[in-house]
Amino acid sequence: MTSLLTFCAAALMEIAGCFAFWAWLRLDKSPLWLIPGMLALALFAYLLTLADSPLAGRAYAAYGGIYIASALLWGWAIEGNRPDQWDVIGAAICLVGMSVILFGPRTLPA
């Protein structure tokens, strides 16, 4: 469960950091937006190292489902774009995949 909370925090940082670049390049915001953006992206990378997984690739794969759902929620909360049924179905499929990767029974390598 710790990984799930870590992934949620990481998603917030990644999306906020990337949005800072989006705001600068696409919305004509000040380059000063890049400062908190880069800090958020650095915190995102650090948070992913806290995932309860011995393998980086598996942690990143599981994180992907959380990222997708979080990005849709960001679009709704920050950009006012309510997810449609296809967004919700797609995110649900990704979260099922994330659950299989994160919570599936594992045997530890020797």
Curated annotation (Swiss-Prot):
Chloroplast keyword on record: no
* Membrane-spanning segments: 4-24, 31-51, 59-79, 85-105
UniProt KW keywords: Cell inner membrane, Cell membrane, Membrane, Transmembrane, Transmembrane helix
For this protein, the record's InterPro entries field holds:
UPF0060
Question: What SUPFAM superfamilies would the database entry show?
Answer: Multidrug resistance efflux transporter EmrE
Q: Which cellular components does GO assign to this protein?
A: plasma membrane
What membrane topology is given? Multi-pass membrane protein
* Compartments reported by the entry: Cell inner membrane
Family of this protein: Belongs to the UPF0060 family.
Known HAMAP family for this protein?
UPF0060
- The protein in question is named UPF0060 membrane protein RPA3838
The organism of origin for this protein: Rhodopseudomonas palustris (strain ATCC BAA-98 / CGA009)
